[in-house]
Amino acid sequence: MENFKHLPEPFRIRVIEPVKRTTREYREQAILKSGMNPFLLDSEDIFIDLLTDSGTGAVTQDMQAAMLRGDEAYSGSRSYYALAKAVKDIFGYEYTIPTHQGRGAEQIYIPVLIAKREREKGLDRSKMVVFSNYFFDTTQGHSQINGATVRNVYIKEAFDTTAKHPFKGNFDLEKLEKGIQEAGAHNVPYIVCTITCNSAGGQPVSIANLKGMYEIARKYDIPVIMDSARFAENAYFVQQREEAYKDWTIEQITYESYRYADGLAMSAKKDAMVPMGGILAFKDKSMEEVYHECRTLCVVQEGFPTYGGLEGGAMERLAVGLHDGMRQEWLAYRIAQIEYLVAGLEKIGVLCQQPGGHAAFVDAGKLLPHIPADQFPAQALSCELYKVAGIRAVEIGSFLLGRDPKTGKQLPCPAELLRLTVPRATYTQTHMDFIIEAFQKVKENAENIKGLTFTYEPKVLRHFTARLKEVE
């Protein structure tokens, strides 16, 4: 299939879900009813749903067939061992705990690692700091609930939508080490490496950067947890952009990447392609004590450690999905789809972050310069996009970042982005063209879009359930 300008989707569509079309008047009422928060819209009122790629895409025929092998035994399920083998083969990690999704893993490992640091190194909880290239929202939330101050240490190009860099997800290694020294290594219970880096625009982390980060972590005896939702997309970018790995397979790059962490926490609803599921895993004997403590906590919060909130069939499906999500031709198609969408948006003058792995990230701050950050320009843009075309997207900016839990002040956000998250094997090029046309209509009315203010603001992870209104 060489020498074609565009290749079609590398799959056949066998099952479809009808969607309804609505009127502008209907959508205006729906978004008002939802408190100007697209999270609170009913899915049946969405024409194209770009809220998330988490569990919203298609599954492969092999994944669906695998569910028939499910062993629903309460303990010792053979389906658990199928999943554990997949984790061992792909990542090289010895100890696996299934969870219902990624945040299930976070609520287990975070308090365990904090308690371990306190017990062994004398951690002072009032001075506790944790570091990441950029924390995902639930990882940040669980860290803060457990009393930690979160620090994101990213490179200067990360949020500059006018800058090009092959690995915008990279840690700023100098800032990382300086931050550890300032906090005191004993007060740093873990480092989280997010691949790809969602908040920066689905941007990858290079293996060279992973090595440097892990060297610093080893120097100060701090465990590293890989936030692994989009591990396969990260491996694809490494293959395409990091010279030393251009001839490596996705499988080889993935295995190599995970040498530079001590554990992984995964929402398997992204690159592993399942509707529900997560994984917590640890590398080797050095993390055996942590593994056993996490197993104990799993019983209380998720379920027995050999099912962790998942039925046997779901574990079988996940074991297959981990492999299916790493297919070379699949990843090439997926990244090309994002590149097509970004190119189309920029052609009509809508500035985006350079194409990442799972979404197009529109620079709402540039498109709506008249709306200040504390009136959430990306959230306002999301509401307008829904009114115009029935498209649901998600804000990645000040609204999501939230307030400092100690001072109550809005945290400064490096960019105000609107994420157009593309579910896997769900939408075609025609959908991408429709999205681009919708933005053309939004852009024509951009100066009339109003900022937003709260009518209800939760204290934690406010973006999920907050309600807002337009600023008069």
Curated annotation (Swiss-Prot):
Presence of the UniProt keyword Ribonucleoprotein in the record: no
Keyword Iron: no
One Gene Ontology molecular-function label: tryptophanase activity
Names of required cofactors: pyridoxal 5'-phosphate
Pathway involvement of the protein, from the record: Amino-acid degradation; L-tryptophan degradation via pyruvate pathway; indole and pyruvate from L-tryptophan: step 1/1
EC number(s) stated in the UniProt entry for this protein: 4.1.99.1
NCBIfam families: PRK13238.1, tnaA_trp_ase
Quaternary state and interactors: Homotetramer.
Name of the protein described by the UniProt record: Tryptophanase
